[in-house]
Amino acid sequence: MSVNSIHLVGRAGRDPEVKYFESGNVVCNFTLAVNRRTSKKDEPPDWFDLEIWGKTAEIAGNYVKKGSLIGIQGSLKFDHWEDRNSGTPRSKPVIRVNNLDLLGSKRDNAEATMNNYPEEF
């Protein structure tokens, strides 16, 4: 038996990017910043790349903004490609989101937008 399941709660690191395909499929990509439970208050968050498909992608595109508090459930996958300049194989971990929970109130989300998370790392 094997299990590939991830549950995270954090804040959107940037506004979602939504792409519509001719086939009718929709994909949404953005980052999630998750703070670790630690006694160090200055520790930076962990960053995760998220990929959401279908109706959930449209919901994320409409309601998630930079700083929004969300919960996700999904699975880990690796995107693989070849570097255009060097031809070196590359890969990066991506979380394929199956369930998205919009957490917090509108006021919480408005305040979070003023949070000082750096853009991407």
Curated annotation (Swiss-Prot):
GO terms for cellular component: nucleoid. GO terms for molecular function: enzyme activator activity; single-stranded DNA binding. Keywords: DNA-binding. GO terms for biological process: DNA replication. InterPro entries: NA-bd_OB-fold, Primosome_PriB/ssb, ssDNA-bd. Residues 3-104 form the SSB domain. It holds the Pfam family SSB. PROSITE patterns: SSB (PS50935). The keyword DNA-binding applies. SUPFAM superfamilies: Nucleic acid-binding proteins. PANTHER family: SINGLE-STRANDED DNA-BINDING PROTEIN (PTHR10302), SINGLE-STRANDED DNA-BINDING PROTEIN, MITOCHONDRIAL (PTHR10302:SF0). NCBIfam families: PRK07459.1, ssb. Homotetramer. HAMAP family: SSB. This is Single-stranded DNA-binding protein 1. It comes from Synechocystis sp. (strain ATCC 27184 / PCC 6803 / Kazusa). The gene is ssb.
